[in-house]
Amino acid sequence: MSDFKKLQVWQKAHALSLTIDRICKRIRGSQYASLRSQLFRAAMSIPANIAEGRRKNSDKDFARFLGYALSSCSEVEYHLIVARDTKVISDSDFVSAISQTITVRKMLYGLLNRLSVPEDDGKVKGSKVRKSPQPKAGPPTAPSR
């Protein structure tokens, strides 16, 4: 696999992690230490999982790590909402970070769709459409009474 730093999604995720780092440094108060830590760790996890997955030997493994990165995007989004609602970050910091998070999430979904790695349940990773089960052969049976 090629160098993860060349992936646009990794570059955007890395930029997001730096934005979150700057935001976390401005969150004050010991009562917010857990929120600060979780937000920071979730943000750092996104580019880390992209990088780790890119080094794997198969698209299936890469897709699995992209799924982890997507989960971390959701976690970042939630922690940002909490930080905004508790007034520990500014509205402008929230808007900037949430916009970057949404961009990264869309890019991850796009990359997953291009990989088209089937999951065990017949769903293509990252898609919203499941494969339809094949109808059983044979005549329909009458309902029993």
Feature-to-residue mapping (PLM):
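Short, C-terminally biased terminal segments at protein or domain edges
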Residues: 1-145
